[in-house]
Amino acid sequence: MQLNGSQIFVEVLCEQGVDTLFGYPGGAVLNLYDELYKNANRITHVLTAHEQGAAHAADGYARATGRTGVVLATSGPGATNLVTGIATAYMDSVPMVAFTGNVPTSSIGKDGFQEAYIEGITVPITKHNFTVRRVEDLADTMRAAFRIAQSGRKGPVLVDIPKDVTAAVCEFTPKQPEPIRTVTTYNEEQVRWAADLINAAQRPLVYFGGGVRSAASCQPLRDLLHKAEIPATYTLMAAGVVPYGDPMNLGMLGMHGCYTSNRAVAECDVLIAVGTRFSDRVALNPKTFAKNATIIQIDIDASELGKNVDVDLSIVGDAAYVLNAMLPQIKPAKHPDWMTMIQSWQAQDYHPVSDPTRLMPHQVIGEVCNQCGPDAVYVTDVGQHQMWAAQYLRHTKSRGFITSGGLGTMGFGYGAAIGAQMALGRQQRVVMFTGDGSFHMNLNEACTAVSYELPIITVIFNNSVLGMVRQWQTSFYGKRYSQTDPHRKTDFVKLADGFGLKGYRCTNLPEFQEAFADALQQKGPTWIECIIDKDEKVLPMIPGGGDINDIIME
């Protein structure tokens, strides 16, 4: 059948199972938006306040579901406004397809109105990108973009579509989506060697990351831990893969991880790293990281093997396939001496002391867990509040904690929460944690949450400073607080009212308990401002370049 480019665009989106699209219209994408208008019953378009918010929403949608997030923006500034969101997804291996409009093909390279070379700009932050110069290539290019985003190590793909391509006509043939390509092969001898090392270990430890968030990987990982009594620690991106309360779960590792996890890495004799890249927030000193251990690394991306830390055995493959192949070769085991050592370290873990005269982050987060139960999805911005959420939430679901890890994007949270809420439905509870610094970055997305009546509860930790940077200035820069006290006078309760949502302000725990309970009853979005002390710290902390011997506990 004969279709124009805009019709092909919609048909392929539907063919690929896209039900929700985040974006912002503009001149170069008017033809696409006209077709989306005609097909509003097939694809829900979510209009955000800013293209960056749309990109983060597509990201949040993908993280909450595992499906590909889709974002659409016009040419020039519309496209460049996506860059931070695309880079955020790239660093955390999130499947996303970003569509951008462009000037007509005859005008490319002539510095026309709202022209930007977005293909070149995004080369370092995408798995692949395309510029479609012929309408005949549009359908298969879009299909390739979705396939690439989900295949192997997941990530964002950009498709740039000049305006004339959206109007041109060609023959279109519908196709079934191709199966997702994953790495099903692995070196069987390496897997046997890994199993032998694990079976011989006296102090084994599993260290896992975001590469095991899929349901297919979670269960074999848990089976490995319990079959051979192997304790485990995880990165920020993997919270919830092994549930809170599991006796094998030692807690988060790294700069703001717990004492036990960091000590266990230093003392283990075999470290099994699964779906993780030894980032500099975990392996703060690559030369001393797990220095007593034989290190096994399993990763779907061969380029990550041994990149940041020298490893003794590397296995290329999908974690689910490798772990399932390894499990029958693992002998049931107990490690009583090792577990006794770990229990002694757990007695030394940092536990904040509550102060009844003020509101403290661990109290707030604990109360959120009490009132929400195990099924809520939590989203964060970036800063101290992000680490407090990672430390104190009772993570139980592999996709229940959504945060920007690799890029550390302030302003990520509200857009991502909108995407997660749209993906999961209004009956699913989504709570977003932010700080007054991060929230100022993209709080304009409140109008999006209001427009779509999304019942997102936003908890704002307000210490009136840029807390994480200020903490570093306190510890390492002689308390010289350069530009971390912005002296802002924002009244978040009044601002909430201006956006058309309900706002609360709390200075103690009973006030927060009452406010959160009321927020749970609201049909639309709410903000709860929590006034906390500006000297509140994220502890423990290991300085950059340090190790367990440098940990700060007070």
How does the language model describe each region?
Residues 99, 107-109, 113-114, 306-308, ...:
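Thiamine diphosphate
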Residues 136, 174, 292-384, 509-513, ...:
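Phosphate/pyrophosphate-binding active-site segments
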Residues 1-333, 367, 371-374, 429, ...:
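N-terminal alpha/beta PP-like core and its mobile active-site loop of ThDP/TPP-dependent enzymes
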Residues 9-10, 14-19, 27, 32-37, ...:
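Active-site diphosphate/adenylate-binding microenvironment
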Residues 61, 80, 337-354, 420, ...:
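Charged, low-complexity, helix-prone segments enriched in Lys/Glu/Asp/Gln
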Residues 24-26, 45-56, 71-78, 133-134, ...:
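Active-site nucleophile and cofactor-binding loops and adjacent substrate-binding regions
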Residues 69-71, 159, 378, 401, ...:
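Well-ordered beta-strand positions enriched in small/hydrophobic/aromatic, beta-favoring residues
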